[in-house]
Amino acid sequence: MSNYDFLKPRKRKKSLFVVEGEHEKDVLVYLLLKVFPEIDIAEEDVVIFRSNIYSLYDAIEKEYGEDWDEIGVDLVYLMNKQGRYEFDFEDVNFNNIVLMFDYERQDPKFSEEKLCRMQRYFSDSTDVGKLFINYPMVEAYQDFSGWPDASFEQVEVTCDFHIVQEYKVRVKDTMVAKMVDLPNVIGRTLKNRYHMSQIERRSRCTEALLQLRPEEVTEVVLTSVLSHFMSEEKVKSARYQMLSLLKLSEHWKENLTYYEYMRLLFKDIIKHNIYKACSIVGGSYQVESSMLHGKYFDLNLLEVLECQNEMCRKVKKGMIKVLNTGVFFVTDYNISLIG
């Protein structure tokens, strides 16, 4: 019997994300919520656990005992007790709970049994929560050499600790990574070159620039936008600097706003990761558009994990297929968002 049966059941109305680190919250989830505004999730409901999945497992076992998956786990209660998320227990209700963590086979606490237990238990975001594991890490969604990238099906990385550390550095040079980083590049330029020290002002200026459609941009338009945030003297230099940054971006070449382009890009990223997950469990990477929805709902993330474990277990060539399942929270929320 659970020690928490006396607690009144909560009517679930909100969404809660439990993620491993800053990149998941401040970059990936933030951007996905931005480009898919149909997803009704508040940024403040994304909780950074600040440790890996094995530490979360230990916290669950400490709170609920070895038979935690038979007793039942209340993640909202656990996050609140650990001081990760503060709310009025009686008033805040959740209808969607998502966990997003890295595979991290190189961790000293790594255990296939523990991972499989977690994946098996956390399988429903509308109930106890749904676990999305990224292989080898969250940055896997950036691992595309160009777009489209037919080679993604074969992209893999060794399970060796040092190579995994190098992986994060390698993906920083990809097209997707550069697109994701564009708002930061603009923000840093505004701060360092034009001394825009106030974070809120810098953020609003960056946002205004990213909302511009290339065909509408003239010297007059750029001057008008920038003049809201800096002196006339700085505008003269900044408009050329900002225009040069924007022109180098992929969205500019496609005559789209930044967020229009990123929405299309993430739709394709999600689809390619669905294709790859299907191929990992023995299916075909080539999935017809008309069959995509059915293939996704037939996908078993525990089976994906077991296949990845088996590949990594090989002594001579322990490899793991690069895969980001974290982006699947979009399709879980509403698969029609990806077309």
Which residue stretches match the model-derived regions?
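C-terminal accessory helical subdomains adjacent to catalytic cores in phosphodiester-
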Residues: 2-12, 26-47, 57-61, 79-339
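Conserved beta-strand elements of the Class I
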Residues: 16-18
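Extended charged low-complexity segments that act as oligomerization/scaffolding linkers
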Residues: 46-72
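Short, flexible loop segments at the rims of nucleotide/cofactor-binding pockets, characterized by
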Residues: 74-77
